[in-house]
Amino acid sequence: MKATVKGRYEGDKATAAATLAFTPSAADLRFKASATDAAFARGPSLEGLILTLEKPGSFLLDLKPHSKDVRFQFMNSALLLDRRVSLTYTHSTTLSPGPAKLPARTALDGSLTFDPANKLSLSHTLGSSGCRVKYSYAHGQDRLTTIEPCFDTANNAWDFAVTRKFQGGDAIKATYQASTKLLALDWTRDSKIGASFKVAASFDLSDQSKAPKLIAESTWNYEI
C-alpha cells in the first residue's frame, strides 16, 4: 500500500490532501482514496473525498460521494505504421437526483508519437466549437529541453511552454497564455527520499498593478 501526503500554500491559505493507494498482488487493478482538508475541517465528512478504481493504461473511474459526481475515463494505444497512437475518452456527469452543479462533459484526447522527441496531441470537448492542438518537441540527445506550442482553435490563441530538466531532479518550466496574457514560472525538485517540491509564480501581464501569485507545494510518498 502506498500513501501520499501533499501540502499546498497559496498566499495566506494553506491546504492539505492525502491519498491511499492499494494494489492487490494478484491483479493489475488499483484502488485509491483521496481526501482534502475539507473532509475534516468541520468534523469528518464526505466533502473532499474521492474514490478511484483504475487499471493503468486501460480505464479509470472517479467517484465523489459528497456531490455524487462521477468521471469515467477509457484509454488505449496501438502502433500504426510504427507510430504510437493513443486515445482517451473522458465523460463526467453526476448521479445526484437534483439539478447538476456542472453539466455533463465528454472529451476526446488523442496523441501521435512520431519518435521519442516529437509528439502531436489533440483535445476536443464534444459540443464545443473548437479543439486544442499541441506539438511537443524534446531537444538534444538527452531530451532535457522540451518546447510545447499549443493552439486553441475556439479562441484563436496560442499557448507556449518550455521545460528544462537538470541533473539531480530539478526542472524549470515557463508557460505563456496569449489569450489571457498570463505568464507562469515553475520550479520543481524530485528528491531521492520519495518527496517532491514545487514553487510557482504567475504574472498577469494584462494588469501589471497586480502582485504576482505565489504557490508552494510539497508531496511526500510512503510505503505502508
UniProtKB/Swiss-Prot annotation:
Residue pairs linked by disulfide bridges in the UniProt entry: none
Cellular component annotations (GO), alphabetically ordered: chloroplast outer membrane; etioplast membrane; pore complex
Residue intervals on the Cytoplasmic side: 1, 29-32, 65-70, 112-116, 141-154, 179-180, 223-224
One Gene Ontology MF term: porin activity
Compartment list: Plastid, Etioplast membrane; Plastid, Chloroplast outer membrane
Bilayer-crossing regions: 2-11, 17-28, 33-42, 56-64, 71-80, 102-111, 117-126, 131-140, 155-166, 170-178, 181-189, 213-222
Membrane topology: Multi-pass membrane protein
Main location, first listed in the record: plastid
Biological processes, Gene Ontology terms: regulation of monoatomic ion transmembrane transport
InterPro entries assigned: OEP24
Membrane side Chloroplast intermembrane: residue ranges: 12-16, 43-55, 81-101, 127-130, 167-169, 190-212
UniProt entry keywords in alphabetical sequence: Chloroplast, Ion transport, Membrane, Plastid, Plastid outer membrane, Porin, Transmembrane, Transmembrane beta strand, Transport
UniProt record similarity statement: Belongs to the plastid outer envelope porin OEP24 (TC 1.B.28.1) family.
Subunit structure: Homooligomers form large rather nonselective pores in plastidial outer membranes.
Role summary: High-conductance voltage-dependent solute channel with a slight selectivity for cations transporting triosephosphates, dicarboxylic acids, ATP, inorganic phosphate (Pi), sugars, and positively or negatively charged amino acids.
PANTHER family reported in the protein's UniProt record: OUTER ENVELOPE PORE PROTEIN 24A, CHLOROPLASTIC-RELATED
Protein name, as recorded: Outer envelope pore protein 24, chloroplastic
Provenance organism: Oryza sativa subsp. japonica
